[in-house]
């Protein structure tokens, strides 16, 4: 691995940033996967399964906030929209 930085501290910062970027990508990916699973469940699954997948998506969002990957307001907005989708599909039927 070739580092462009000159000083020892700059090289260390690059390594730290790479490590954090990998961690953040993994967490973001987990959030996106949970949301996609929930949205697929809205179309085909019964309400109980969709509700459980909604819980998992909310949990993934909360974990991402705790780890500082996404802002709490962003997570709140996403949770609100997911809950609204759930209610519109299952309260109507």
UniProtKB/Swiss-Prot annotation:
Q: Which residues form a coiled coil?
A: none
Using the UniProt annotation, give all residue ranges assigned to the region (Disordered): 72-93
BP term (GO), one: translation
Q: Which SUPFAM superfamilies match?
A: Ribosomal protein S20
Q: Which Pfam family is one of this chain's hits?
A: Ribosomal_S20p
Q: Which GO terms describe its cellular component?
A: cytosol; small ribosomal subunit
- Entry-linked InterPro entries: Ribosomal_bS20, Ribosomal_bS20_sf
Keyword terms of this UniProt record: Ribonucleoprotein, Ribosomal protein, RNA-binding, rRNA-binding
Basic residues: bias regions: 74-84
GO terms of molecular function = small ribosomal subunit rRNA binding; structural constituent of ribosome
Q: From what superkingdom does this record's organism come?
A: Bacteria
Q: Does the keyword RNA-binding apply?
A: yes
Annotated function: Binds directly to 16S ribosomal RNA.
- Give the family this protein belongs to, as stated in its UniProt record: Belongs to the bacterial ribosomal protein bS20 family.
Name assigned to this protein: Small ribosomal subunit protein bS20
Q: Which organism is it from?
A: Carboxydothermus hydrogenoformans (strain ATCC BAA-161 / DSM 6008 / Z-2901)
